[in-house]
C-alpha cells in the first residue's frame, strides 16, 4: 500500500463527505493522511480503510488548536513527504439563537471552522508553491449564502471558509496551486441528490480543473 504520490491530507475526517472525498482521492492513487480529534474513532476509521486496501494513516489533532494542528501536519510531512492535496473539513455545529451565543463559544467555533484552515494552508502552501502544483480544498456550506439565526457560529464559519478559499485561490493560482471550495447548498444524506459520493465528485472536478479563481467555487445544489 505505497504510492509515488504525496499524501492527500483530510483535516476533520469522519463519516460522510470527508470519507467520500478521501476514498475518491485514494482511487486516484493518493495515500491518505487523516486528521481528527478523536483518536479512537480515527484508529477505527484507518482500520476500515486498510480493510479496503487503501493506504491511510491517522494523526490525532485538534483543528481549533494551531499548535496541535501544526504538529500533526509536521508529522505527516516527516512520515510521508509533502502533501499534494488537502481537504479542510473541520467545523462545529452549535445550534441556538444569535444572542444566546457566547463570545467564548463563538471564538472556539471560529478557530475550528476557519482559523484552522488558515493554519493548514500556511503550513502546506509553501511546498506546493515550490513544486508549482498542489490542491487546497475546503468544505463549504449553504449557510455561507443563506445564514440562519439558529446556526450563528456555523453560518459565520461557512462564510469565513468561503472567503478564505476564494482569497487563497486568487493568491495561489498564479503560482500553480489549485484552491477551491464546494458550497454544499443542502442536507448531506446517502441515497439523495446530496449523497457524499456525488459531492466528492465536485471536489475532484476542482482538483482536475485549472488553478483559476474563476472556477474556485462550485455551489452544489444536488
Stretch-by-stretch model annotation:
Residues 49-67:
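Rossmann-fold cofactor-recognition segment
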Residues 30-44:
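Conserved glycine-rich Rossmann-like NAD(P)H-binding loop of the short-chain dehydrogenase/reductase
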Residues 92, 99-118, 161:
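Catalytic Tyr-X3-Lys loop
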Residues 112-130:
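Amphipathic alpha-helical dimer-interface segment in Rossmann-like NAD(P)H-dependent oxidoreductases
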Residues 166, 174-222:
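C-terminal helical subdomain
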Residues 14-15:
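Conserved glycine-rich cofactor-binding loop
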Residues 72, 87, 120-124:
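Hydrophobic positions on the long internal alpha-helix
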Residues 129, 135-160, 166, 173, ...:
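Catalytic loop of short-chain dehydrogenase/reductase
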Amino acid at each position: 500500500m505505497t504510492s509515488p504520490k504525496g499524501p492527500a491530507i483530510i483535516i476533520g475526517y469522519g463519516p460522510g463527505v470527508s470519507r467520500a472525498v478521501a476514498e475518491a482521492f485514494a482511487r486516484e492513487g493518493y495515500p491518505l493522511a487523516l486528521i481528527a480529534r478523536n483518536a479512537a474513532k480515527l484508529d477505527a476509521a484507518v482500520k476500515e480503510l486498510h480493510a479496503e486496501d487503501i493506504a491511510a494513516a491517522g494523526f490525532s489533532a485538534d483543528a481549533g488548536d494551531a499548535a496541535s494542528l501544526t504538529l500533526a501536519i509536521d508529522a505527516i510531512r516527516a512520515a510521508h513527504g509533502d502533501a499534494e492535496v488537502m481537504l479542510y473539513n473541520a467545523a462545529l455545529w452549535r445550534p441556538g439563537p444569535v444572542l444566546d451565543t457566547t463570545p467564548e463559544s463563538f471564538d472556539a467555533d471560529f478557530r475550528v471552522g476557519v482559523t484552522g484552515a488558515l493554519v493548514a494552508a500556511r503550513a502546506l502552501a509553501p511546498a506546493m508553491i515550490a513544486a508549482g502544483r498542489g490542491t487546497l480544498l475546503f468544505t463549504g456550506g449553504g449557510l455561507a449564502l443563506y445564514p440562519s439565526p439558529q446556526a450563528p457560529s456555523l453560518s459565520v464559519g461557512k462564510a469565513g471558509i468561503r472567503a478564505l478559499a476564494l482569497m487563497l485561490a486568487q493568491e495561489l493560482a498564479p503560482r500553480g496551486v489549485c484552491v477551491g471550495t464546494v458550497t454544499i447548498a443542502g442536507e448531506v444524506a446517502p441515497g439523495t441528490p446530496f449523497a457524499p459520493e456525488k459531492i466528492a465528485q465536485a471536489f475532484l472536478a476542482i482538483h482536475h480543473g485549472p488553478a483559476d479563481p474563476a472556477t474556485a467555487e462550485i455551489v452544489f445544489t444536488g
